[in-house]
């Protein structure tokens, strides 16, 4: 997809699970579980996705996903898995690498959106900015 001078790419960064009750709020489980199944801990499986905007001058990553450096306790609680999806693999499928990212835009401070900003394999070049 292209918007203005930017080509847009969907970048899958990880899989994880969140409590179905927290995700669906006041919607009763018998209603939402018709479409989404939960595991034995009532977590629903989700995929984190970032958006990459590419122009001749910039490669802008919007959000970074969960990241990879989680204590085992939190990996287990949130069922974080980067085996199938991670930033490097997803950027690579489009011919890019994290070293080419010039800017990162953080939409908000939830771990599944900015977890890779401060401690992960995502490496920004010295001219990259958040």
Name what the model sees in each region.
Residues 120-126:
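Conserved small/polar residues in nucleotide/adenosyl-binding loops
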Residues 66, 111, 126:
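Short, glycine/acidic-enriched loop or turn micro-motifs at the edges of active sites
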Residues 101-112:
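Metallo-beta-lactamase
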Residues 3-7, 14-89, 93:
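Conserved beta-strand hairpin/beta-sheet module of binuclear metal-dependent hydrolase folds
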Residues 9, 99-102:
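A short, local hydrophobic-aromatic micro-motif
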Residues 115-119:
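Metal-dependent catalytic neighborhoods of phosphoester/phosphodiester hydrolases
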């Amino acid at each position: 997809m292209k918007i203005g001078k930017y080509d847009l790419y969907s970048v899958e960064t990880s899989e994880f699970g969140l409590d179905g009750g927290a995700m669906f709020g006041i919607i009763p489980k018998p209603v939402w579980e018709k479409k989404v199944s939960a595991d034995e801990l009532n977590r629903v499986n989700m995929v984190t996705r970032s958006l990459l905007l590419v122009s001749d001058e910039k490669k802008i990553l919007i959000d970074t996903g969960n990241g990879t450096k989680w204590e085992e306790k939190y990996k287990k609680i949130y069922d974080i898995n980067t085996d199938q999806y991670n930033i490097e693999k997803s950027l690579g499928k489009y011919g890019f690498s994290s070293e080419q990212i010039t800017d990162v835009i953080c939409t908000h401070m939830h771990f599944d959106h900015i977890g890779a900003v401060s401690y992960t394999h995502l490496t920004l070049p010295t001219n990259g900015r958040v």
